[in-house]
């Protein structure tokens, strides 16, 4: 069920397109938790953040079925722009890659399958934009592993879909509330 704000945004912005609709439909058909999909409104926001920031190197933690990574890649304005994305569930890889192929962004995204904590230790950075939408219990640990890889003032939206108001999630995400404001930084609620 959409909120009034989501209905307004959808009514006043461009459609998500056939490839993203395909990813959304396949997510609903082929996964147990389709509500984890970023969706059209958040996807449009991510595309816009990428375009406005001019980000060239993007990191996404939590790929799920590839919808948000596709949106980030679609927003790249530089021909050499790239998205690195991390997903722990290897069973989603075929769906992810098929969706990116349909969206025409496969060559702009590197999918890394495995534990984000281990992968983040190896990724050199820097990243102009980081989107975190993975295991909420590990947000503060992700933050500690990426903070030195983000230039000062780089945007870092943290995805809090689901129930961010739950104390356990809210407490673990409090590290983001203490980040000094910078251009494009969107703190969690």
Predicted regions and their residues:
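A short alpha-helical cap/connector motif
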Residues: 1-131, 136-157, 162-189
């Amino acid at each position: 069920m959409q909120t009034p704000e989501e209905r307004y945004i959808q009514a006043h912005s461009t459609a998500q397109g056939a490839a993203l609709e395909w990813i959304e439909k396949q997510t609903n058909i082929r996964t147990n938790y389709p509500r984890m999909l970023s969706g059209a409104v958040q996807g449009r926001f991510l595309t816009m953040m990428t375009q406005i920031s001019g980000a060239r190197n993007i990191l996404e933690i939590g790929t799920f079925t590839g919808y948000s990574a596709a949106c980030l890649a679609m927003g790249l304005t530089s021909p050499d722009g790239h998205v690195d994305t991390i997903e722990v569930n290897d069973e989603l890889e075929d769906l992810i890659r098929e969706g990116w192929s349909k969206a025409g962004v496969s060559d702009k995204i590197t999918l890394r399958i495995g534990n984000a904590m281990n992968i983040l230790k190896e990724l050199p950075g820097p990243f102009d934009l980081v989107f975190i939408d993975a295991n909420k219990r590990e947000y503060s640990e992700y933050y500690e592993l990426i903070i030195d890889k983000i230039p000062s003032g780089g945007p870092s939206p943290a995805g809090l879909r689901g129930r961010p108001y739950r104390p356990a999630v809210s407490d673990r995400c409090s590290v983001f509330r203490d980040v000094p404001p910078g251009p494009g930084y969107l703190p969690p609620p």
